């Protein structure tokens, strides 16, 4: 897996509202982490998940993604989730990088 942490990474294909609901439920069951954009990080502050923000816009997200993936193992989580990014513009570069790190594992909600 390309630039993948040892911790399992799973992508969630959903809108923001369903993603937040899914994370809130998963955080009740096990120790989880999430890698999200800054706006999503704010909505997950009280979820019980360990939250890693990779930036406030697509450019910073693309720039910070590998560093954030490497920091995942330090969280001590059972699993880490990320929402599947938009495939438009620079989002496509983020998509291509993170899907490889997740070993192409996607949950569609």
What are these regions (language model features)?
Residues 1-103, 107:
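A C-terminal functional module that forms or caps the active site or interfaces directly
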């Amino acid at each position: 897996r390309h630039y993948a942490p040892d911790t399992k990474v799973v992508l969630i294909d959903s809108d923001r509202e369903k993603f937040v609901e899914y994370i809130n439920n998963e955080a009740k069951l096990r120790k989880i982490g999430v890698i999200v954009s800054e706006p999503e990080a704010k909505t997950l502050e009280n979820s019980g998940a360990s939250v890693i923000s990779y930036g406030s816009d697509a450019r910073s997200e693309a720039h910070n993604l590998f560093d954030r993936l490497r920091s995942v193992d330090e969280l001590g989580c059972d699993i880490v989730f990320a929402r599947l990014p938009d495939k438009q513009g620079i989002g496509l570069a983020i998509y291509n990088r993170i899907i490889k790190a997740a070993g192409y594992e996607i949950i569609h909600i």
